[in-house]
Amino acid sequence: MTNEENQKFTKLHKFLFTDNKFKAMKAKSKLLYAIITERQSLTIAYAKNNQDQSQFLDENNRLFSIYSNSDLKGMLHVSEPTIISLKKELIENGLLEEIRVPNANNRLYPKKPYDEYFYANDLDEFYRLPHSIFDNPKYKKIAADSITAYAIYLSRYEYSVFKDSFYDKENKLYCICTNEEIANLLNIDRRKVAKIKNELVACGLLAVKPSLRADLLYVSLPEVSHDKELKKMYIGN
């Protein structure tokens, strides 16, 4: 895995893939949830100092986001009706509360499962998803399921790095994550996992070495875009 010194990461919460209540949600809804729960800026002062007006704390120290539908459709490169539909799915599953604000963008309160709000000092289990997989045009057409699968593969690979004990005959570090595991976490047909892996291989994010028991997986971080212009996120079909 390449040096992650210049990488920034978004948090993709694990309960979206392990709790049966949320597993059937659309992959794009889960990625939208990751965007609106981004918590790099936890105070109004920090947000203002860094010219980031998307994250705030209310009078009860609850985190909320301010994103217009136009902002969100630009980030995910989908239509405004799609954003409205994705938000509706999050609301119906108890993961989002939207408070209307007169003459301003609505407040978006991302929620943890079972009616818990996010607070400033929360620590959560999550998969790390590199920002550059959205920012770099090289990856703009990767499907939503492939992006979420990549986050899972990356987490498994990081565990191999931590354990420092999973090496092949060429002394290269690898991880194992079966197609059945991915299919179960993403709530998809097992046959689709092969397509996902092929897409990640084609993009240079994954290398696969067939093995009798389970494929050996080698995960690479995405290339960081050196273009200073803000790129739109594109989530493929």
Regions found by a protein language model. Give the residues of each.
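Charged low-complexity intrinsically disordered patches
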Residues: 118, 198, 202, 223-237
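Short recognition helix of helix-turn-helix/winged-helix DNA-binding domains
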Residues: 1-67, 105, 112-177
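Hydrophobic transmembrane signal anchors and adjacent membrane-proximal interface regions, especially
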Residues: 33-34, 190, 233
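Winged helix-turn-helix DNA-binding recognition segment
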Residues: 41-108, 159-223
